[in-house]
């Protein structure tokens, strides 16, 4: 198994384009990134962005449009239209690309020096837990994207049915930040396995019907309950916020954190302000970790019980 980082200006351009078009109202939309990416836009560009936004929003599967744009598969008229009308904006994007290019090259080289030998058997166990064949653990490509200068940490995306990960690393490069980037890559890799799992869908649906539906709980703003379940499991596997997650021994060289380990810091957060949805989901995912670890190490398959500890926490903190 290998994960290879690469620089592809066209992929980065289409990621920038979909961000500045502001088509997405889900939790994946990041306003600070939108503001930074958009500072190069001129008033004359607005009709192009409006048209791009309309095309993406009108599609029954917007993320499939993005997947094909990033894969440079312009196999229908809407994809070809986006590529054609957006071409004049490449000059706008170029200043952002040039600003971060040197650091992205350093990140590419650092990521490609990572070893995944110790992670491969663990990922195979996760695949089995999800009801997948061990061969589901395959090579992947990481496309590096321009980060905003003030970003507090790396961020990634994994589009269903794709064989690549989109990654915005830290704006600046140093050795101390490598661990955080590696965790984000494995978090997104976990999403890729989860997206393939019918057992995950069945377990999540059963948990929803048992714990969410009877209480008529409304999903958090920008989320569907399916995306909440997806993030709970992916964070439980790999997360910067909760000390690494299930893969912590391989990613950080440290034991997996427990609820008792992390409770003081979460209590301090609660005393200061209301946690963000991302923090709540991370905290809730930590409550799943003991059961998830037992299931994976014992070769058991995912079921409804995996989610019960986390959903109770989500219910308490969102109610």
PLM features: what roles do these ranges have?
Residues 99-161:
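Auxiliary, metal-adjacent structural segments of Zn-dependent hydrolase domains
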Residues 246-319:
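Pan-zinc metallopeptidase signature
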